[in-house]
From Swiss-Prot:
Domain of life assignment: Eukaryota
Function: Regulatory subunit of protein phosphatase 6 (PP6). May function as a scaffolding PP6 subunit.
Gene name of this polypeptide: PPP6R3
InterPro entries per the UniProt record, alphabetical: ARM-type_fold, SAPS
Residue stretches spanning the membrane: none
Region annotation (Disordered) ranges: 628-659, 693-715, 729-755, 767-787, 840-873
Low complexity bias: start-end ranges: 729-739
Skewed-composition ranges (Acidic residues): 644-655
Protein name according to UniProt: Serine/threonine-protein phosphatase 6 regulatory subunit 3
Length: 873
């Protein structure tokens, strides 16, 4: 929305680019230069694509900024240059990848002496990496021509950005064939051997770490690629070279050469751990103890790697006994002399990984060296080192759950549960695991009884004891573990049994009880357990089985059919379209010249229905349709009626006849005022000549219905106003607020409805009635009115009225096309209330006036023939 309406402030860059002498630094000083570049600003990109601008951008990246500059702005232009070149603009990438002069200038950064500027190296690596990903063939061909590229990468491997560039070269090339060519090229350049040579005590720590991390990433990337491409015809040459025995032997010989360098040893062990990474299947009951990497066996360990490590196990064992020299460490707990150190911790991790392979030759070597006993001693010696405790716990869990052993030639032999598991026997007999657990537990309880602090390894010791108990009951070596416990001295065995039932049981109970008593949410899984525990007698077993079957069927159907179908709920747009389509099918054709049979049928139906009505009730029928007519002022109505003068003034005779129907013999300017506060128990019929009435004549009503006061002089307003017309209604004939107000329309003559025309004409001539004079002298005002056609439903009949709007007062005027008579609505007009036909039927036939002549009856009959039944507005 913000950009759509162009509400953002215009960039100053466009103004600068209009200058001919604008410089690159002036553009780089602008804050929004990066945004404009990424937004593909055409002028800016054309400026940056100039040869001198691209050379300056590359120069900012590879050249050291002056030392005398302020540190805050010293690397401003190199940073902006890097962002501009790596904004992933195709034109810039094409120019950099195609012009060899720019690539040579960029490549010259590697020719600098080590160590490189870390920040500039990151800029260089980022630019070259995006070029490798966008233009892999051009960049790889360029690098292959540079015979010293691999040498320079190895030279600057201590810089982390150069290590990232090497990994980008292996990962950013997605097509299989170009990637395979890059791997073969790097393998021919002996990249693996050169990285292994860096892991040497003579090299510095940064080079150790980056070389080790590079080799580890190469191993992981190669294995992942092998899993993704199952049908790969060519193996990964880098991984194959790294898994060779001579490479592993070279790596181990480097770290054990003369002096012991902790950085080199740790880096080499990290490479070995990556080579030994396998995802083994978890064993039951030891999920919490085993590391997440043991989920399943995905990678197979090359036996050449195991053989090379086995030959150097004695050297690793010596590291456990005599680690590299470390200074005494003072901690809050006490003095550590010597501390565990990273070297010994990684050696124990290596032993744990070797135990995961479960190779018999390696296990035999560990038994002879008593490496398990040494790490157990370290477990109880270093009370507060939880990293050490975790690795020892994993080693013991792996030994207890190792049912199979791999031979030296890689085959796996099945052992009987009572067979010889030498490593397990070594753990129980020589290492005396049970005795040491009991001694440590009793020592901790004694220390706590004296007010001392609980040992830090007690949690791990509890888990190890639970692991032994679980292996006794279940697990692949349950029989052997039970036999080994029985072979323990009787005193030790009794202490162990007492410990399992008392101390260990209480500890487990205490660990499983929630410390905070809160209201727990009831789980749905608990319901299933409750249902399963319900017992049934033997006689009802078949019935219960059948009930279970029915419940399964009902549950599956209930779950599938529960709720509402999504198809039943369409989008709002769909619903709107459907309703709109249906509206288009409705026929709005209205025919005002309907046959008189329809009106005759409705009149007969009304007569039938009225037989069931209470004739003597003055109360209003709530189910009866009310007719509303707006009685306007006479002059306005005449003016409105004159808009269609060609229809309403066909002849002087018709004009005279229709005008007489609306004239009052008393005063046409009289105004009617109705007291609405009178009680609503009145009965009257204010039928307008256009209304179709049923029943007897109404001429005998006379002036008793209305008692009018002396009319007031009319105001010279040019419009009939009824607001000042006062009418005194009797208490029983008060006007009802909800009485219908009729609208006058005309239609074809209908003879059956003209029987009582005489009474209607007599009523119109009564002095107390309200009359409206329809004249045609307002034709000059018709030019200011707008005419609109309006459709009015008259019962089952349809009529089209012309809606005329006065331009001055915006008064809506309804005009009938047939009758050429119109009514209008103004804010000052009153409602003329019409009583329904049933009141007229109750009036006696003597209401007809005595002076009604046959000529009047004939005119009224003719008029009523043109009247149609009014429908509600």
């Amino acid at each position: 929305m913000f950009w759509k309406f162009d509400l953002h402030s215009s960039s100053h860059i466009d103004t600068l680019l209009e200058r001919e002498d604008v410089t690159l630094k002036e553009l780089m000083d602008e804050e929004d230069v990066l945004q404009e570049c990424k937004a593909q600003n055409r002028k800016l990109i054309e400026f940056l694509l100039k040869s001198e601008c691209l050379e300056d951008l590359v120069s900012f990246i590879i050249e050291e900024p002056p030392q005398d500059m302020d540190e805050k702005i010293r690397y401003k232009y190199p940073n902006i240059s890097c962002e501009l070149l790596t904004s992933d603009v195709s034109q810039i990438n094409d120019r950099l990848g195609e012009e060899e002069s720019l690539l040579m200038k960029l490549y010259s950064f590697l020719l600098n002496e080590s160590p490189l500027n870390p920040l500039l190296a990151s800029f260089f690596s980022k630019v070259l990496s995006i070029l490798i990903s966008r233009k892999p063939e051009q960049i790889v061909d360029f690098l292959k021509k540079k015979h010293d590229f691999v040498d320079l990468v190895i030279k600057h491997i201590g810089t982390s950005a150069i290590m990232d560039l090497l990994l980008r070269l292996l990962t950013c090339i997605e097509p299989p064939q170009p990637r395979q060519e890059v791997l073969n090229w790097l393998n021919e350049e002996r990249i693996i051997q050169r990285l292994v040579e860096i892991v040497h005590p003579s090299q510095d720590e940064d080079r150790h770490s980056n070389a080790s991390q590079s080799l580890c990433e190469i191993i992981r990337l190669s294995r992942d690629q092998m899993l993704q491409v199952q049908n790969s015809s060519e193996p990964d040459p880098l991984l194959a070279s790294l898994e060779k025995r001579e490479i592993i032997e070279q790596l181990l010989s480097n770290i054990f050469h003369k002096e012991k360098n902790e950085s080199a040893i740790v880096s080499a062990i990290q490479i070995l751990l990556t080579l030994l990474e396998t995802r083994r299947q978890t064993f039951e009951g030891h999920i919490e103890i085993c590391p997440p990497g043991m989920s399943n066996s995905t990678y197979s360990v090359n036996k050449s790697v195991l053989e090379a490590i086995k030959a150097r196990l004695s050297s690793f064992h010596e590291l456990l006994l005599e680690p590299p020299k470390k200074s005494v460490m003072k901690t809050t707990w006490g003095v550590l002399d010597p501390p565990v150190g990273n070297t010994r911790l990684n050696v124990i991790r290596l032993i744990s990984s070797l135990l995961q392979t479960n190779t018999s030759s390696v296990n035999q070597e560990l038994i002879e060296l008593n490496s398990i006993g040494v790490i157990l001693d370290m477990f109880f010696k270093y009370t507060w080192n939880n990293f050490l405790h975790t690795q020892v716990e994993i080693c013991i869990a792996l030994i207890l759950a190792s049912p199979l052993e791999s031979t030296e030639n890689g085959t796996i032999t099945d052992q009987d549960s009572t067979g010889d598991n030498l490593l397990l026997k070594h753990l129980f007999l020589k290492c005396q695991l049970i005795e040491r657990i009991l001694e440590a537990w009793e020592m901790n309880e004694k220390k706590q009884a004296e007010g001392g602090r609980r040992h830090g390894y007690m949690g791990h010791l509890t888990r190890i004891a639970n692991c032994i108990v679980h292996s006794t009951d279940k697990g692949p070596n349950s029989t052997l573990v039970q036999q080994l416990i029985k072979e323990l001295p009787e005193e030790v065995r009794e202490r162990w049994e007492t410990f399992c039932t008392s101390s260990l049981g209480e500890t487990n109970k205490r660990n499983t009880v929630d410390l905070v008593t809160t209201c727990h949410i009831h789980s749905s899984s608990d319901d299933e357990i409750d249902f399963k525990e319900t017992g049934f007698s033997q006689d009802s077993s078949l019935q219960q089985a059948f009930s279970d079957y029915q419940m399964q069927q009902m549950t599956s159907n209930f779950i599938d059919q529960f709720g509402f179908n999504d198809e039943k709920f369409a989008d709002q747009d769909d619903i709107g379209n459907v309703s709109f389509d249906r509206v288009s099918d409705i026929n709005f054709t209205l025919n005002t010249n309907e046959s008189g049979n329809i009106a005759l049928f409705e009149a007969c139906c009304k007569e039938r229905i009225q037989q069931f009505d209470d004739g003597g009730s003055d109360e209003e029928d709530i189910w009866e349709e009310k007719h509303i007519a707006f009685t306007p002022e006479s002059q306005r109505r005449s003016s409105s009626g004159s808009t269609d003068s060609e229809e309403s003034t066909d002849s002087e005779e018709e004009d005279g006849t229709k005008q007489d129907l609306f004239e009052s013999h008393a005063n046409t300017e009289d105004k009617m005022e109705v007291d609405l506060n009178e009680p609503p128990n009145w009965s009257a019929n204010f039928d307008v000549p256009m209304e179709t009435a049923h029943g007897t004549n109404l001429d005998s009503v006379g002036s008793d219905v209305w008692s009018t006061e002396e009319p007031m002089p009319a105001k010279e307003t040019g419009w009939a106003s009824f607001s000042e017309f006062t009418s005194s209604l009797s208490s029983t004939d008060s006007l009802r607020s909800n009485s219908p107000v009729e609208m006058e329309t005309n239609t074809e003559p209908m003879d059956p409805l003209s029987a009582n025309a005489t009474g209607l004409a007599t009523q119109l001539e009564t002095p107390g009635s309200v009359a409206m004079e329809a004249s045609s002298d307002g034709e000059e005002d018709a030019e200011n009115a707008d005419k609109v056609t309006e459709t009015v439903m008259n019962g089952s009949m349809k009529e089209t009225l012309s809606l005329t709007v006065d331009a001055k007062t915006e008064t809506a005027v309804f005009k009938s096309e047939e009758g050429k008579l119109s009514t209008s609505q103004d804010a000052s007009c009153k409602y003329v209330v019409e009583e329904n036909a049933e009141v007229a039927e109750e009036a006696p036939s003597a209401l007809q006036p005595a002076n009604s002549s046959p000529e009047q009856r004939t005119d009224q009959r003719t008029l009523l023939g043109e009247t149609s039944v009014n429908g509600p507005v």
